[in-house]
């Protein structure tokens, strides 16, 4: 029983994120134990609504609003909404498995990592042990393992 307790105490959740997907891996010690990661498509329905609304406003040349560029690019909006979705998923996973995960490692391309950092809740901040600014969503388990544990 003690060996099992020691093993679970070292379990890490690795989240590999881009603006459209999140891959979740389990790791024990310095080895990823997930053969096939949990792949989640991030919910960005709100983003499409914003895009249509913004485009129609800027296409109408008779309104004064069309003279100004939007302060926030659509890409930035997409990253922020994806980050919110990521945090929602991570909260769900870590809350449901509080005894299971002791560490959270986040891997995302730099801009996405910044957005995720801004959205992090205090509960998640406590377990984040490493942040890596790389886009590894399309990479295999070995590449993710090398990036995290090298």
Curated annotation (Swiss-Prot):
A Pfam match is Host_attach
Return the InterPro entries for the record: Host_attachment_protein
Give the source species: Rickettsia prowazekii (strain Madrid E)
Provide the protein name.
Uncharacterized protein RP470
């Amino acid at each position: 029983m003690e060996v099992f307790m020691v093993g679970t105490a070292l379990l890490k959740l690795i989240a590999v994120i881009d603006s459209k997907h999140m891959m979740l891996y389990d790791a024990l010690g310095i080895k990823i134990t997930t053969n096939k990661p949990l792949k989640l498509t991030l919910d960005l329905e709100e983003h499409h609504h914003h895009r249509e609304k913004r485009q129609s406003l800027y296409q109408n040349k008779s309104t004064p609003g069309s003279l100004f560029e939007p302060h926030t690019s659509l890409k930035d909006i997409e990253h922020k909404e994806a980050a919110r979705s990521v945090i929602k998923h991570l909260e769900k996973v870590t809350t449901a498995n509080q005894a299971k995960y002791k560490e959270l490692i986040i891997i995302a391309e730099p801009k996405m990592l910044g957005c995720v950092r801004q959205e992090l809740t205090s509960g998640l901040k406590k377990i984040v042990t490493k942040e890596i600014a790389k886009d590894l969503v399309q990479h295999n388990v070995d590449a993710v393992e090398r990036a995290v544990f090298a």
